[in-house]
C-alpha cells in the first residue's frame, strides 16, 4: 500500500500532532479523556506552488491542523475509525486541490488495558473518488 501511495505524487505531511479528547467505547475514556496523536498526509500537485512560491497555489498546513484539532477536541465519539474518518472527510473539503488523505490516529496511553503496549490506533486512506 505504501508503494501505491508513493506513486500518487506530491503531498503535504503533518507528523506528531497531539490533542486531548474524550473518545472511546469505555465510559472512563469519555469522562477522563486522554491524549490522541495523529499523522496526516494530504496528496495534491505541488508543482505550481513550487514554482510560484505562493501559498495560494497550495493548501495551508494550518488549515489541515485546525481540522484535526476541531475533530479531536470536539464532540466525543465511540470509535477511532469515526474520528479518523471525520478528519479525512473534512480535510478533503478544505480544497479541491487535495486529491487524497491518509490519517493515522492513535492513543499512546491506552486506558484500562492491563498489558504492556505502545499504542492502539487506526490508519485510513480516503480519496475523492471514494469519498
Swiss-Prot record:
Q: Provide any one GO MF term from the record.
A: dihydroneopterin aldolase activity
Pathway listed for it is: Cofactor biosynthesis; tetrahydrofolate biosynthesis; 2-amino-4-hydroxy-6-hydroxymethyl-7,8-dihydropteridine diphosphate from 7,8-dihydroneopterin triphosphate: step 3/4
* Residue positions of the active site: 107 (proton donor/acceptor)
Q: Which UniProt keywords apply?
A: Folate biosynthesis, Lyase
Q: Please state the Enzyme Commission number of this protein.
A: 4.1.2.25
Offer one Pfam family short name for this entry.
FolB
Q: Does the keyword Lyase apply?
A: yes
Positions annotated to bind substrate = 29, 61, 80-81
Show the InterPro entries listed in the entry: Dihydroneopterin_aldolase, FolB_dom, GTP-CH-I_C/QueF
Query: In which tissues or organs does this protein occur?
Result: Expressed in roots, leaves, stems and siliques.
State any GO BP term from the record: tetrahydrofolate biosynthetic process
Q: Which reaction does it catalyse?
A: 7,8-dihydroneopterin = 6-hydroxymethyl-7,8-dihydropterin + glycolaldehyde
Root EC class: lyase
Q: What does this protein do?
A: Catalyzes the conversion of 7,8-dihydroneopterin into 6-hydroxymethyl-7,8-dihydropterin, a biosynthetic precursor of the vitamin tetrahydrofolate. Can use L-threo-dihydroneopterin and D-erythro-dihydroneopterin as substrates for the formation of 6-hydroxymethyldihydropterin, but it can also catalyze the epimerization of carbon 2' of dihydroneopterin and dihydromonapterin.
Q: How does it assemble?
A: Homooctamer. Forms a hollow cylinder assembled from two ring-shaped tetramers.
Kindly give the PANTHER family that the UniProt entry links to this protein: DIHYDRONEOPTERIN ALDOLASE 1-RELATED (PTHR42844:SF1)
Family the entry assigns? Belongs to the DHNA family.
Protein name in the entry: Dihydroneopterin aldolase 2
According to its UniProt entry, this protein's organism is Arabidopsis thaliana (Mouse-ear cress)
Amino acid at each position: 500500500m505504501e508503494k501505491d501511495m508513493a506513486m500518487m505524487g506530491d503531498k503535504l505531511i503533518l507528523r506528531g500532532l497531539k490533542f486531548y479528547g474524550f473518545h472511546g467505547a469505555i465510559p472512563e475514556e469519555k469522562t477522563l479523556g486522554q491524549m490522541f496523536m495523529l499523522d496526516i498526509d494530504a496528496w495534491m500537485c505541488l508543482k505550481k506552488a513550487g514554482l510560484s512560491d505562493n501559498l495560494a497555489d497550495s493548501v495551508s498546513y494550518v488549515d489541515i491542523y485546525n481540522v484535526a484539532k476541531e475533530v479531536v477536541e470536539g464532540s466525543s465519539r465511540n470509535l477511532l475509525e469515526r474520528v479518523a474518518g471525520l478528519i479525512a472527510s473534512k480535510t478533503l473539503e478544505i480544497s479541491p486541490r487535495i486529491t487524497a488523505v491518509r490519517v493515522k490516529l492513535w492513543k499512546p496511553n491506552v486506558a484500562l488495558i492491563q498489558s504492556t503496549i505502545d499504542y492502539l490506533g487506526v490508519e485510513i486512506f480516503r480519496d475523492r473518488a471514494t469519498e
